[in-house]
Amino acid sequence: GTLEIRGASTHNLQNVDVDIPLGVLCVITGVAGSGKSSLIHGSLPTDAGVVMVDQAAIRGSRRSNPATYTGLLDPIRAAFAKANGVKPALFSPNSAGACPACNGAGVIYTDLAMMAGVVTVCEECEGKRFQAEVLEYTLNGKDISEVLSMSATEAEAFFADGTVTKPAAHAILTRMVDVGLGYLRLGQPLTTLSGGERQRLKLAIHMAEKGGVYVLDEPTTGLHLADVEQLLALLDRLVDAGKSVIVIEHHQAV
C-alpha cells in the first residue's frame, strides 16, 4: 500500500503529489530547504496511525531523567520495595525518600540577582539525592543511587540477572540500548541531552506503541558512524516487524 499526499503546498512546496510506499524503509532526501520536512510534517494524513519522533526538547523539569521519562523508575522502585519490604515511594528522589537538604535534586541552586545562578553539589547527600537511610536498602548489592548511576547497558545486564529479573524494566532498557543510548546514565538530567539523544529516547518509548508508521526527522544528527549502523539495524527490525518507517535525512549512510 501507499500513503497518498496530494497537492502539498506548505512553505516552498507547490502542489506536490507523492505516493509513499508502506511496509518498507523510505527515505525523504534533498538539499537543505528543499521542503523535506514540509512535505511530511505538513502533508501526511493525520489519521494514518503515524508516530512522529522529532528532536524537540522533552517537556519536563530539571529533575527529569531517562528513568522517569521512559517509565523505567516505576518497576525499579517496585523491585527495591519488594526486596526490602518497604513502600516504593522511598525510592523516588521526588517523593518520600528525597534528601531534605536539596529536596532530592542532588544539587543546590543559588540564584544570584545580577549573574547566572550557581549550582553546587549537595553536601548532605553528596549528590546522591536520597536520604542516608534509604541508601541502606539494596537490591542485589546495589542501592537506588548506584542503580540510577548505571548506564542503560549496565542496568540491562543487572535486571536480566536471575536474582533481579524484572521483565518490565529489562524491556525498557533493551529498547534504550537498541536505539543507541546504551551509554546514557539512568539518572542523567534530560536537560543535558542533545537533540539526537532526545529523539532516540522518544523512539525507545514509541517502539512500545502500536503505531504502524514511524516518521523520524534526521535521526543521525550527532551520531558516530558505528551508531548510524546500529540505528539502521533498528529501523530494519521495525520494518521486519511490519512497521512502515519514513526517514527525513541527508546522511549518505542512510
What are these regions (language model features)?
Residues 1-254:
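Conserved phosphate-binding elements of NTP-dependent enzyme cores
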